[in-house]
Amino acid sequence: MQQRFTPRTGRRIAAGIAGAAAAALMLTACSGDTGSVDVADEAPDELSGTVSLWHFFTDREASVIQGVVDDFEAQNPGVTVEVHEGQDDEKLRKVIAAGSDDIDVGLSYSTDVVGNLCSTGAFRDLQPYIDRDEVDMSQISDTVQSYSEFEGTRCTMPVLADVNALFYNKDIFAEAGITEPPKTLDELEDIALKLTEYNDDGSIKRLGFNPFMGMYENTAAHFGPAVGGKWLDDDGYSAIGSDEGWPVLMQWQKDFVDEIGYDKLQAFTAGLGQEFSADNAFHTGQLAMTIDGEYRTAFIADQAPDLNYGTAPFPTATGFEDLYGAGYIVGNIAGIAKGSKNPELAWALLKYLSTDTDALVKMGNGLKNVPTTTAALESPDLEVSEQYQTFIDIALHPKTATTPPSLVGAGYTQAFGSYWEKFQAGTGGNLAEGLAGVDQEINDSVDLVSGP
């Protein structure tokens, strides 16, 4: 199966923290303006001309985007949209940094680039267009708004989102007499241990839940809402080491790993099928519970249609019960490239993709990602199964969290994730000292990009 470029896979193929800093420096060096442009007092009565759209989708998913583009052209007969599919973020940034005018609208799979694109002017400031056209930004949640702007500059608009939740196998639950999914991390561990089975040689046959950091969607970002983990302070520096929640979450996860055995978990995890294949361990019953995104519902429908499963918000830690029902959200973002030859037409297309209810619902149904406006989330035309409803509810929850844009892109999440994997292996040393080291690594990288 072809790898899908999304917020989840984008982070997997991204470079390390040094690479993120280097990319930011490259874009900064090649972008000298702020992205501010003169905007006409009124939007044109009639749209005409040619506008280019660069996006990362391929194959079936690209056809979904094309269908929405066709609708836009049908509503605006004088407009031609030149679509360039399969364009990843690295190419997008390089083309913009080179000063090319080939890109009008760029659609990215990751919010990791927002800090760079906004701060360097690689994407234009959209606020003048938003103000002029009186776009109702209140239809987009504060959290989603936060990951599509940087330090007061809105250079992107959100276009669909990924939301994470707990998946659980109803048949395995029923066999064990379990009637409800866990709501706390302690309940999650208790149920998981009850559902875990071993082979005669002591190796793991089935896991109730795999706590192993780095397995499938097991990341700090996805686990973080269980304690309301804070990433950055108001100045863009690391808040990880000073946050009260992260040590609680990390110690719970480490103790869970130790309860089963690091070596056993490592061996079991290494033998699991690929995440985006039919052999995904939740599909096969090797995992009774797992954390995953709304897109998993589409994979199950296609690859394991007989699987009897449910979804629920991911559990929260003791003392953080008020966060239950929330979760993690991140998504695709789109903006107008600084070299756009037709920014007015580019804005019209961007506004359509990011705020038109019919367009968002059509993309949501076709891609099985979560729409990013309240109107689209509540539209009767949105195809919502019982399992999918969980993700809608999480997206609408006021305490749902995200990873904020940064000058170092994904660098800060990668630095933390790297240390966490050492900690779970027992090689991370003292936790407080380790987190202080993570803070220092992140802050040094922010200073490197920020300059004197």
Where does each model-flagged region fall?
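Long, aromatic- and glycine/proline-rich binding clefts that accommodate carbohydrate-like moieties
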Residues: G364-G411
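Extracytoplasmic/periplasmic solute-binding protein
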Residues: E151-V159, N164, E189-I240, G245
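Conserved C-terminal helix/tail region of periplasmic/extracytoplasmic solute-binding proteins
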Residues: Q3, A174-E175, L396-P452
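Short helix-initiation/N-cap motifs at beta->coil->alpha
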Residues: E85-K94, D112, L185-D190, Q266-H283
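Extracytoplasmic/periplasmic substrate-recognition and gating elements
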Residues: A176, D258-E259, D263, A301-K368
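Glycine-centered hinge/linker elements that transmit conformational signals in sensory
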Residues: A192-L193, Y237-A270
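Conserved N-terminal structural module of periplasmic/extracytoplasmic solute-binding proteins
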Residues: Q2-G115, E134-M137, L272, T318-F320, ...
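Hinge/lid segment of periplasmic solute-binding proteins
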Residues: Y109-V163, K205, G224
